[in-house]
Amino acid sequence: MSMQVVGKGLFVCYSVFKKCSSVILSLIVLLSLSACNAEDAVYREYRCYFLFDTQLHPMPCQLTGIIGNPGHFCHVEASLEKGIRHIKSTRNYDGAVEDVPLTTDRENQQSCILGANNCIIIGTSSYDNVLIAYEGQCANCLEQYGGTRYPLSWQNNGTLLHCNKCDRTYDVNNGTVVSEGGGRQLYRYQAAFDGQFIRAWN
């Protein structure tokens, strides 16, 4: 084999490697940017940490019922009664309220912090079948007035959330304002389901 052929082969290999390296580098940059954007969208003004074990609380538990059911959401609040933590959920489509006592040692020892005023909204979007969690107070009122008590109520069979303070209405499936006047969308927390635990955090 002549040196000329070997040289051409090496040149071709180098060219392919250079192109592949450029593509891989571009992908890494894009993934990094999208990860940063996702992180930037997470509300961090008030701490959120919620963990719910669906194996300990199987169906017909309302919170467990949001998994895999597009359009199903719950208001979630926490309280401590006689040393036992309770999770109160209010379902969007019928307003049903459920009180779930967390009676195991593990559940009672873990933190439960629910945003600005002890309330988050969590469920599965009917637009993209993704689990999402929102701050339970009106984002525009939190931003405009300060304080922490601007609760949202279900409307239109649970597809909308309404704030009585500013009269804004939000689409529960993506958090955007759908009433006149516009405004910022609902604040979001990270949310995930790993097959056992429903999580929301920031």
What is the role of each PLM region?
Residues 37, 139, 164-167:
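Sequence contexts marking disulfide-bonded cysteines in secreted/extracellular proteins
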Residues 40-153, 190-202:
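N-terminal pre-ligand scaffold of iron-sulfur
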Residues 164-202:
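Short Fe-S-cluster ligation motifs
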Residues 32-35:
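C-terminal motif of bacterial Sec signal peptides marking the signal peptidase cleavage site
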Residues 29, 131, 156-159:
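Residue-level signal for mature regions of secreted extracellular proteins and peptides
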Residues 145, 157-158, 162:
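Cys/His-rich short segments
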